[in-house]
A protein has these predicted regions:
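Acidic, glycine-rich active-site loops and adjacent beta-strand->loop/helix elements
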Residues: 16, 39-41, 220
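Extreme N-terminal leader/targeting segments of oxidoreductases
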Residues: 1-10, 28, 240, 251
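Accessory "access/gating" subregions that flank catalytic or transport cores
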Residues: 3-5, 222, 234
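N-terminal Rossmann-like FAD-binding beta1-loop-alpha1 element of flavoenzymes
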Residues: 10-35
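Conserved N-terminal/central alpha/beta ligand/cofactor-binding core
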Residues: 38-213, 237-259
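A conserved short coil-to-beta-strand element within the FAD-binding core of flavoproteins
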Residues: 216-229
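Short hydrophobic core segments
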Residues: 10-13, 220-221, 233, 245-250, ...
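Loop/turn elements at helix/coil->beta-strand transitions in domains of secreted/extracellular proteins
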Residues: 8, 29-32, 210-211, 231
Length: 259
């Protein structure tokens, strides 16, 4: 059996948005990370989602005319939590999520506010707002990913060539036969990607631009631990079952879950 050992600051299991965002953030803070994806393609469950991100008091909504207070955002979140969410964590989310959005924008990830919808989940409860607090990834061409274009999972259950805002404005998926056919054809030729797929592609582009190591077909078999603390993992590439690569983390192992 051939074996190899490598050391990183952060070892990330899974290439959905959590893994990609974690790798991007790690790099910006001067840490070396590696992403291990079990599947042959990138994206995890994120590519099958609409990729909406709820961020109260975000700068994109404010620039589009949304005026709201921190107290309103907190009231809405507390209503959604129903008393079952630790208030310190809830407050941290409300206070930090707008800055996290700005942080990833500075990293080159492009977002847009979703206009034309009221607040997500409930629109007439304490703290709710008539203007959407949701943002989505801007459309990105798959060709911007170079050789990685074909290595991102493309869903067949979500129309990714339109933004969520456009889909809502055009009457939803049931009205798809009446959408702008010329625009749809143009975007398909350009391989424009939005929603969860677009979100993954935006983050993957930023990660690849920074030289972060991304490995697919990595079947993680074992987590290494030292005094109860996870310190690394052992993976077996699907195409080379006789080769075991042990990846040791100097700081953290980040694992995502998929159903």
């Amino acid at each position: 059996m051939i074996s190899a050992e490598r050391s990183y600051d952060v070892v990330i299991l899974g290439s959905g948005i959590a893994g990609l965002a974690g790798a991007l953030a790690a790099h910006e803070f001067g840490l070396q990370s590696v992403i291990l994806e079990k599947a042959a393609s990138i994206g995890g469950a994120t590519v099958h989602s609409y990729g909406l991100i709820w961020v109260g008091q975000n700068h994109l909504a404010q620039a589009a005319g949304c005026s709201e207070s921190r107290d309103e955002v907190l009231a809405y979140m507390r209503f959604l939590g129903g008393g079952n969410v630790d208030d310190d964590r809830l407050t941290a989310f409300v206070d930090w999520s707008p800055e996290v959005l700005r942080f990833f924008e500075r990293c080159g990830v492009r977002f847009r506010v979703v206009r034309g919808v009221t607040d997500h989940y409930y629109d007439e409860v304490p703290g709710s707002h008539a203007f959407s607090r949701s943002v989505e990834a801007d459309l990105i061409s798959g060709f911007e990913l170079g050789d990685w274009r074909e290595r991102v999972a493309v869903p067949h259950d979500v129309p990714c060539f339109v933004t969520a805002e456009e889909q809502i404005a055009w009457g939803g998926v049931n009205s798809a036969p009446h959408w702008n056919a010329a625009l749809v054809q143009q975007r398909n030729r350009q391989d424009m990607r939005g929603k969860g797929l677009g979100l993954v592609c935006q983050f993957l582009r930023a990660v690849l631009h920074r030289g972060v190591t991304v490995l697919t077909n990595q079947n993680v078999r074992r987590l290494a631990a030292d005094n109860g603390r996870v310190t690394g993992s052992s993976s077996v590439p699907a195409s080379l079952s006789e080769r075991v690569t042990a990846l040791f983390s100097r700081l953290a192992v980040m694992a995502q879950t998929r159903r």
